[in-house]
Amino acid sequence: MDWESPSNATCCAECPVRVTADIIEHKWTTLIVRELVSGKKRFSELERSLVSISPKVLSERLKELEAKRIVCRTVFPTVPPTTEYELTAIGKELETVIRAMQYFGTLLLKSAESLEQASK
């Protein structure tokens, strides 16, 4: 993989890392994508699984992800209306990013645990 130099990457709108960061940079966005990696979810399911997210913020993030073609929304003609969210084909590609973050987070947690034990 070719890496651009940081000076070019930060100012270039076509920088792949910047494009990805623009999608996942907002609070809760990465966790919403993580929840959708396993499949379709209703709004209420997402709300329950993302403890402490407000309905307003969840709605905003889902709209942003839909506008960026990461998430697809399907509304069913029921009373009350049922809405499901799922990752689009390109959205599903973010699973590798989420898995890399999970791996890195696990390393950090283990490292912090090791440092804590060593200081005792």
Segments (PLM) and residue ranges:
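N-terminal intrinsically disordered/low-complexity leader segments
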Residues: 1-12, 120
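N-terminal helix-turn-helix DNA-binding core of bacterial DNA-binding proteins
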Residues: 11-57, 84, 92, 115
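Short, solvent-exposed amphipathic helices
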Residues: 19, 93-111
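Basic amphipathic alpha-helical segments that dock to polyanions
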Residues: 58, 62-65
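Glycine-centered, phosphate/nucleic-acid-interacting loop/turn motifs that mediate DNA/RNA or nucleotide
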Residues: 69
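Short beta-strand "wing" residues that participate in macromolecule-binding interfaces
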Residues: 72-73
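Basic, amphipathic "hinge/linker" alpha-helix immediately C-terminal to the N-terminal HTH DNA-binding motif
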Residues: 77-101
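Short, charged recognition helix plus adjacent turn
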Residues: 111-120
